[in-house]
């Protein structure tokens, strides 16, 4: 993502980041302003930002296999999910296949309605069951709540509920195609899925 940072003196500083997303642009703009106010040279600021590769589990590129790009992100709240999907949508791929694992029963119960529009820019959405993170199950609280919210708010988006995480890798292996981006999101144990799917695709292509 690239943008111009306009200073109070009328000077424009071009900034280019190797990571996508409006949220990254905003963070970079804040960092650049602070650095410039502290006396840093504009060239040094733009050079430093041009080498920023992101942090672990924040739009982290996990590889490419059989023409499928794999990206993993820690996003687990509605606003984070929407920002991450918006960033991913700017990529040059055929389909954006989002995979979301709700985090904690208490959070899912409180926020499930807010997820309805968060996935609107995806082409296909998979939702797993809730990652408990030490919490006990709650009656009526599952990943199905997220599915219901998305179907209500985004009727044109195809959403599939894969209740058991153990079924997810095989499901993705059968669905993903050349030119797709598989974006996994959540604060649970979904982070290993990109590696597992790539191993499956490697085995299938041998």
Where are these regions (language model features)?
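Nucleotide phosphate-binding/pyrophosphate-handling subdomain across enzymes
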Residues: 3, 7-124
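Glycine/Thr-rich phosphate-binding loops of Rossmann-like dinucleotide-binding domains
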Residues: 13, 106, 135, 192-193
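Short amphipathic alpha-helical segments
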Residues: 83, 110-112, 138-139, 173-174, ...
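Structural beta-sheet core signal
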Residues: 98-100, 127, 161, 184
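Short glycine-rich anion-binding loops that position phosphate/pyrophosphate groups of nucleotides
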Residues: 102-105, 130-133, 187-190
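C-terminal helical cap/extension that packs against the catalytic core
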Residues: 116-178
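A short, gly/pro- and small-residue-rich
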Residues: 142-150, 196-206
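A glycine-rich beta-strand to alpha-helix segment
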Residues: 167-198
